[in-house]
Amino acid sequence: MDEILKQEMQKELTTRILPYWMERMVDQENGGFYGRITGQEELMPRADKGAILNARILWTYSAAYRLLGREEYKEMANRAKRYLIDHFYDSEFGGVYWSLNYRGEPLDTKKQIYAIGFAIYGLSEFHRATGDPEALMYAVRLFNDIESHSFDGLKNGYCEALTREWNEIAFLLFSNSEVTSLIFFSDSGW
């Protein structure tokens, strides 16, 4: 990669992108991270918190810590890991909840394999960056949950969404944002 481009990208990452989330999105009152900020920079402190956002924050700051070695990135990653395990992880049935309310209480308890996959990515990267055995243990647990509850041997594939107790959902409606994601990924060849 061109050295100038690499330096510009690293500067953008370390002076704008990573600090943005550290300064604006940490929920000091209820734990974890705020679930929403508008395009006009209006924070929505009572917005629901999603597993995917938390897991992406975990992966991002874990990777940033691994590559750049800054302690504040490790602290952000650890905050995301703790919140994922303490609030999103379903200690009774395994997997992670799709969403929590702003206070960190389960809201939508269905098991979305997409969200569990992101949790595995984040926890695995945290383990890679820090050697943390707890992160690895939960990543393996979540992987095993997918294999034991989502794999359909008859169809040789995986069920995307299940109830909290890992039962099939007969009819699943997607939100507008979920439909947009599905359209983007199917149209882009992902």
Identify the function of each model-found stretch.
Residues 1-190:
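Glycan-recognition and catalytic cores of secretory/periplasmic carbohydrate-active enzymes
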